């Protein structure tokens, strides 16, 4: 095979926040994503499983693009990386009806793909999941080295008596890489995920309780003076019956890092399976 005809396949897993890491890595290499999907995650609650869901496939490039759609059963391996699994009678990949499965999208254009769930067996209570892939196909006239994007969109469907239950064994913050670390067991029949908001202010601004009162745990709004930084916290899911350590990083711009005092307060409000966890971390940093 001639080296000039080698096709490089760049796979981008689009899981809530995980995708941005891979897209960022591609950008650092000078590779701008040509394919985008919205929304990046599909959820059908128990009262929606008979509904049809739609996703929009966008061609961000300057040439027409062909895209092929496929579906897999999946989970995470021990390192929290995507792992393809064989189908089972209860896996959602066996129940999804997708139309169309091959698209031709004009430059800077978009197309809609519809999905419906049609169970082939009586669904067990709880979560059923699949990963739907949108793979950019190599153009026949393409020459040289090509970068093709393969975007995965997780689809979750919930049936019957859904139990979101979890035990949070620990929640810590690593100041070196600005990352929250969670140790969580999902004891129900569906995944759980730590989701919430953070805010950074001066450490001597107020008491811990007063700092927490400024941060709205439902929408992330901040009362009073503008904080140094604020934003959303979310991580990969922990699937039913599993105990996992998951991470959620926050991104601080360089000018914000320089503006921080030698000691600052990081307030966080995190929801895990309906339980709210509130905490203020006092961070000492070297100047």
Q: What is each stretch, according to the model?
A:
Residues 8-19:
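Bacterial N-terminal signal peptides
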Residues 60-63, 75, 85, 121, ...:
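Short, acidic/polar linear motifs in exposed loop/turn regions
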Residues 72, 118-156, 252-287:
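Terminal connector regions
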Residues 45-50, 106-110, 239-243:
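Solvent-exposed, conformationally flexible loop/turn segments
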Residues 42-43, 99-105, 232-238, 254-256:
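Beta-strand-rich interaction surfaces with strong enrichment in secreted/lumenal proteins
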Residues 52-56, 97-134:
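Ligand-binding face of N-terminal immunoglobulin V-set domains in extracellular IgSF glycoproteins
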Residues 28-63, 102, 165-175, 179-185:
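Beta-sheet-dominated interaction scaffolds and their linkers
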Residues 28-34, 61-115, 205-209, 215, ...:
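Surface-exposed binding patches on compact interaction domains or structured appendages
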